[in-house]
Amino acid sequence: MAPKKAKRRAAAEGSSNVFSMFDQTQIQEFKEAFTVIDQNRDGIIDKEDLRDTFAAMGRLNVKNEELDAMMKEASGPINFTVFLTMFGEKLKGADPEDVITGAFKVLDPEGKGTIKKQFLEELLTTQCDRFSQEEIKNMWAAFPPDVGGNVDYKNICYVITHGDAKDQE
């Protein structure tokens, strides 16, 4: 496979769910920005595209280290879907779903996909950015525990990263 085709195939692995995060107008605006940055029009933003974009904005002599750091923010080649995903994650201010799920899994050594309501509530009200009683009340309204007092953290992770509750099957 030619190197350019391999790049495109790897880039195609970006999340397609990102398109549901934005309305059509926003997607079009991101597409226009992507097109401006993709200076050589190959459908992939690379280090030279970034360098050329900075030059077009009057910022010459951008250090390679700075460009490398920008490129490393993506997991691979930056096609439009990856570009949109990166902005979606930045704008939402949330970590990717697998990172959030991984954090919950630490609290679920048996791997059941649930955490006891009482334990989660204690953590949320006593650690780091503590939840208020109002926030706890809202959380249980949105994610009610089952009859055994267990909370489905996979659903919480999905809602944090996608914005809507996952259909229960």
From Swiss-Prot:
Q: Where is the EF-hand domain?
A: 25-60, 95-130, 131-166
Q: Which InterPro entries match?
A: EF-hand-dom_pair, EF_Hand_1_Ca_BS, EF_hand_dom, Myosin_RLC
Q: Entry's Gene3D superfamilies?
A: EF-hand (1.10.238.10)
- Name positions with the PTM Phosphoserine: 15-16, 75
One GO term in the molecular function aspect is: calcium ion binding
Q: Which residues carry this modification: Phosphothreonine?
A: 25, 35, 101
Q: Which residues carry this modification: N,N,N-trimethylalanine?
A: 2
Name the UniProt key words of this record, in alphabetical order. Calcium, Metal-binding, Methylation, Motor protein, Muscle protein, Myosin, Phosphoprotein, Repeat
Biological process terms in GO annotation: immune response; muscle contraction; skeletal muscle tissue development
| Annotated residues for binding of Ca(2+) | 38, 40, 42, 49
What top-level branch of life does the organism fall under? Eukaryota
GO cellular component, as recorded: cytoplasm; myosin complex
Task of the protein: Myosin regulatory subunit that plays an essential to maintain muscle integrity during early development. Plays a role in muscle contraction.
Q: How does it assemble?
A: Myosin is a hexamer of 2 heavy chains and 4 light chains.
- Any extra detail in the entry? This chain binds calcium.
Q: What is this protein called?
A: Myosin regulatory light chain 11
Gene expressing this chain:
Myl11
